[in-house]
């Protein structure tokens, strides 16, 4: 049995804060990050009020530091229009749904070639992806549907296979009909090691998700928000291409807000999320901090000021 470094019992709880967070936010200086944090909160609140998209790009660490319950609560409150995942985020969420645990010890597993070789993750994710491809679905919807079907098949049984559905973004978004897109790099994700991995299915489903994502990005015009949280390479590159596709097809895409949240400000998020897409009109915001502190603080501010 593979050992995991993260358990669902360690996950964050949705904010149930009373008065206090708003006062804290109001007390922040109107300088640098204090000003930027307020701007991010204001942009998200404004987008929801206008009915504009609030798209959350999520890297793997956001899931494995226990923030799914916070994001699911924001889904329920209308602050998440779509979830945009890289491959790692999808893997961690899939494992949490099934086992309530994720994040293996790479140092211990790699010497014997056991890293990324968990049978259940590899087999079931690839089955879900192949089924999605056969039905003309994207990867995000396909993974959510697969997990939800497992929930239904094993409902009421002592050996239910999806014991942690409440902590899964894939399942909760699927149930709420909130789009999830998954953007992978072939060979970068552990399920690609498995004998059931089908490059055509992986590429086909992720490509459909890119098309869906581009259609969502188109709607950011005039008031939408795109947040990149914890993806340093894949999602910033995908977002930049989606922006270019939308504009190439003649659609207006200006006066929207982008937010990058990470514990370091890397080159690609800084350029491809914060700066370049908003050069022709819009606002790019960079917030630096640990996900497990910064994202719950942002969520609490949204809830209290809603």
Q: How does the language model describe each region?
A:
Residues 104-177, 181-182:
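Ligand-binding beta-strand-loop-alpha-helix segment within the catalytic cores
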Residues 88-93, 188-191, 265-267:
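Short gly/pro/ser/thr-enriched loop/turn and capping motifs at secondary-structure boundaries
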Residues 212-215, 222-225, 232-306:
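C-terminal functional extensions of proteins
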Residues 1-2, 15-29, 34-135:
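Metabolite-binding pocket within alpha/beta catalytic cores that recognizes anionic/polar moieties
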Residues 70-75, 174, 196-199, 241-248, ...:
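Short, solvent-exposed amphipathic alpha-helical segments in soluble enzyme
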Residues 66-70, 94-100, 192-196, 238-241, ...:
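Short acidic, glycine/serine/threonine-rich loops at helix termini
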Residues 182-219, 223-224, 240:
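Conserved mixed alpha/beta catalytic, RNA-binding, or beta-rich assembly cores of soluble enzyme
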């Amino acid at each position: 049995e593979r050992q995991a470094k993260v358990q669902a019992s360690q996950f964050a709880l949705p904010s149930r804060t009373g008065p206090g967070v708003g006062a804290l936010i109001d007390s922040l200086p109107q300088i640098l990050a204090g000003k930027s944090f307020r701007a991010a909160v204001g942009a998200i609140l404004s987008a929801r009020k206008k009915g504009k998209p609030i798209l959350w790009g999520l890297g793997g660490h956001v899931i494995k530091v226990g923030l799914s319950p916070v994001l699911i609560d924001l889904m329920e409150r209308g602050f998440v229009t779509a979830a945009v995942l890289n491959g790692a985020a999808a893997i961690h969420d899939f494992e949490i749904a099934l086992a309530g645990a994720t994040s293996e010890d790479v140092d211990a597993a790699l010497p014997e070639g056991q890293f990324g070789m968990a049978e259940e993750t590899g087999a079931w994710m690839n089955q879900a992806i192949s089924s999605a491809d056969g039905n003309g679905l994207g990867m995000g919807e396909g993974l959510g549907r697969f997990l939800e079907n497992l929930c239904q098949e094993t409902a009421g049984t002592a050996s239910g296979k999806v014991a942690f559905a409440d902590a899964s973004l894939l399942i909760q978004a699927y149930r709420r009909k909130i789009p999830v897109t998954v953007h992978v790099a072939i060979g970068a994700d552990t399920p690609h090691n498995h004998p059931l991995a089908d490059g055509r299915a992986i590429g086909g489903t992720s490509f459909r998700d890119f098309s869906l994502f581009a259609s969502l990005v188109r709607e950011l015009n005039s008031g939408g928000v795109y947040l990149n949280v914890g993806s340093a390479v894949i999602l910033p590159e995908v977002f930049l291409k989606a922006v270019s596709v939308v504009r190439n097809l003649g659609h207006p895409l200006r006066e929207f807000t982008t937010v990058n949240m990470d514990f370091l400000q890397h080159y690609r998020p800084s350029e491809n999320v914060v700066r370049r897409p908003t050069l022709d009109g819009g606002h790019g915001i960079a917030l630096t901090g640990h996900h497990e502190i910064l994202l719950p603080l942002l969520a609490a501010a949204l809830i209290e000021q809603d």
